[in-house]
C-alpha cells in the first residue's frame, strides 16, 4: 500500500467581497470549495483548469501562505510513520513542516529579490532554519547550483537576477526550493513564462530531481500537455471544485466529465486536416449543477481509480 506525503480532505477557502463601493452588503466567493485528493511519496499530481478556477489558492492554502476556511490538510509526520494535521503544528514542528513543503512560483522575474546576489538568495532558507555553519552552507549552495545545471557555480553566485536569462532564473528558484531537501513541492506553473525552447529542459530537470531526491509534486498548470509530461495523475478543477481525477493516461484517453472533454478538445493539433469532435459545454448550466449536486456527495469511482463528481451531467455535451 502506498504511503501518502499529503492528504487533503474537503478543503475550503472562501473570500468575502463587497458588493459595491457604497454598499455594506458582502458576498462570499468560494474560491476553493470542498476538494479532496492525496499524493503518495514520489508521485506527482497535476492540478489543471482555466484561469481563476482556484488552483493557486489551493496551493497557497496547502503551504500555509493563506489560512484555509475549512477542511483538513494532513502531512506526513517527520518520522514518516503517520499523518499529522497541519492545524496542530506549532513551534519547532511548524518550522520542520515549512522545511518539508516548498513552493516554486510562476514568475522567476518577481520571485527573486533583485538586490540580492544568487548566493544570498539560495542561502536565505539555510540561514532562516540555521542549517550548518557558514562553510557548510556555501558548499550546499555550490552543490545545488551544479545540480540544477548552473555551472561552474562560482560564476553564478556573485551575479544578480537581472544578469540571468529567464530559464536561468527559474533554475535558481528551483535551487532555492530544493536546497531545503523538501518531501513535497508545490509548482505553480513554473514553466508558463519561459520560452518553449527551454521549457522542456526545465521540466526534465524537475523530473530528474524528483527521482533523485524522492520529491513529490503538486503541479499546477492550464496546459494538459505539460501535465501529461510531468504527472502520474491529473485532477481537473472547475470553479473551485475538482470534477474529475484519474491516472494521467486514463483521464486523457477516457475523459468522462464534459468540462474535461472540453479541455482536451481544445488542445491544438498540428495536422489541420485532422477531424476531431469538439465538445460544446453550457458552462452556466454546468456550474449550477455542480453547485447543486457536487458539494455534499463524494466523488464516485467509475473504475481504474477514475473518479468523477456525482452531479448529473447528462445533456451537457
Residue spans of the language-model regions?
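ABC ATPase NBD Q-loop/coupling interface
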Residues: 72-96
Amino acid at each position: 500500500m502506498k504511503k501518502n506525503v499529503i492528504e487533503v480532505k474537503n478543503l475550503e477557502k472562501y473570500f468575502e467581497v463587497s458588493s459595491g463601493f457604497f454598499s455594506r452588503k458582502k458576498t462570499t466567493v468560494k474560491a476553493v470549495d470542498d476538494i479532496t485528493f492525496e499524493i503518495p511519496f514520489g508521485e506527482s499530481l497535476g492540478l489543471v483548469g482555466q484561469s481563476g478556477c482556484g488552483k493557486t489558492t489551493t496551493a497557497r492554502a496547502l503551504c500555509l501562505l493563506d489560512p484555509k476556511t475549512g477542511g483538513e490538510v494532513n502531512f506526513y509526520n517527520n518520522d514518516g510513520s503517520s499523518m499529522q494535521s497541519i492545524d496542530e503544528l506549532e513551534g519547532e514542528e511548524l518550522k520542520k513542516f515549512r522545511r518539508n513543503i516548498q513552493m516554486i512560483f510562476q514568475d522567476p522575474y518577481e520571485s527573486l529579490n533583485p538586490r540580492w546576489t544568487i548566493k544570498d538568495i539560495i542561502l536565505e532558507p539555510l540561514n532562516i532554519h540555521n542549517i550548518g555553519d557558514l562553510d557548510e552552507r556555501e558548499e550546499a549552495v555550490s552543490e545545488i547550483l551544479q545540480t540544477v545545471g548552473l555551472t561552474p557555480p562560482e560564476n553564478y553566485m556573485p551575479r544578480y537576477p537581472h544578469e540571468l536569462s529567464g530559464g536561468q532564473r527559474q533554475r535558481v528558484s528551483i535551487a532555492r526550493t530544493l536546497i531545503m531537501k523538501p518531501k513535497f513541492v508545490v509548482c505553480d506553473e513554473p514553466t508558463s513564462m519561459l520560452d518553449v525552447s527551454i521549457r522542456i529542459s526545465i521540466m526534465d530537470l524537475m523530473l530528474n530531481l524528483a527521482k533523485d531526491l524522492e520529491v513529490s509534486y503538486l503541479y499546477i498548470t492550464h496546459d494538459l500537455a505539460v501535465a501529461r509530461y510531468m504527472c502520474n495523475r491529473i485532477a481537473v478543477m472547475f470553479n473551485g471544485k475538482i470534477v474529475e481525477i484519474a491516472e494521467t493516461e486514463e483521464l486523457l484517453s477516457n475523459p468522462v466529465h464534459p468540462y474535461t472533454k472540453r479541455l482536451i478538445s481544445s488542445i491544438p493539433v498540428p495536422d489541420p486536416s485532422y477531424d476531431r469532435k469538439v465538445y460544446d459545454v453550457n458552462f452556466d448550466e454546468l456550474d449550477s449543477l455542480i453547485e447543486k449536486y457536487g458539494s455534499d456527495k463524494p466523488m464516485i469511482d467509475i473504475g481504474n481509480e477514475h473518479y468523477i463528481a456525482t452531479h448529473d451531467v447528462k445533456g451537457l455535451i
